[in-house]
Amino acid sequence: MTHPETSELARGDGTVLRYCLYGPPDGYPVVSHNGSPSSRWKWPTLVESMGRSKLRLLVYDRPGYGGSTRRPGRTVADAVDDVRALADAQGWEQFAVFGGSGGGPHALACAALLADRVISCAVLSGVKPADPGKPALEEAELRSQVAEVAAEIMGRIDDGGPELPTGPGPAARDDPDAMARLRATFVDGTDGWVDDSLALARPWGFDLATITVPVGLWRGTNDANVSSEHADYLLEHIPTAQGYVYPGGHLPGAAVYDEIYDWLHTR
C-alpha cells in the first residue's frame, strides 16, 4: 500500500492546510476530523473501509499536524473556517462531517456553526467539554508530557511493536508506510497534539444545544481512553443526538467504520 496523494490548500493569510481524499470520486462528500493525535494518512483496514463506502472523504490535518501551518492559540470552533475553505475548494455546497476522539468536538463545531451546509455529523469515541473548574493547562508542562508519551510510543516501535497498540501485529518498523504514519503523528505532529489538547481544555466556542442536524455518537464498551461519561454527556446536551454502542475499545474494527459510513450516507 502507498498513501494517497497529498493536496495542499493555501489560505489567504499565508497558511496552508494539507489533506488527502479517500473513497470513490463521485461519493457522498464528507469532511473527516482526525483524532488527537493522528494524521491524514490512514492504516490499511480503514482505507479499505473508506474504499468500500459510498463516501468521498476529505481527511485533513489540523494546524500543527502534517505540514498544515501551526496556529497557536486556536480554538475548537476555529476548525469551522478551515472546513468551509476546504469544502469550497472541492465545490461542496453541502456535506457531512465525521470526527474521531479529539476530532469529535471539531466535527460538532461544524454541525453547530455550519448548519446551513452540514447535513449530518458522526462522532466516534468523542470527548465532552472540559470541566470549567479544572485548572488551566500550561503549554510548557503539556509539551513535556506529549514528548514523553511520543518517545514511549516510538520506543515501542523501535523494539518491534505493531503500529496499533490494540493487539498483536507485524513489526511497524519493517513497514515504510506504517513508519511514515507514525512519524507524522508522533515525531512531526507534536505541535498539533499540544494545540489540540489546549483547545479541548478551553471553552470550545459554540453551544452543543444549538445543534439541529442529525448526530450519531458511537462508543466502545471497553474504551480505556474515553469513558462512557463523555458519550452520556453529549447525548444529554445535543438535542438531535442518537447513541450507538459497539463491543470493543477506543479504536474499533472495520465493521464499525462501515456502519458509520453507511449512517452518514443515508442521512
Q: What are these language model-derived features?
A:
Residues 240-267:
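Catalytic active-site module of serine/aspartate enzymes centered on a nucleophile-bearing elbow/loop
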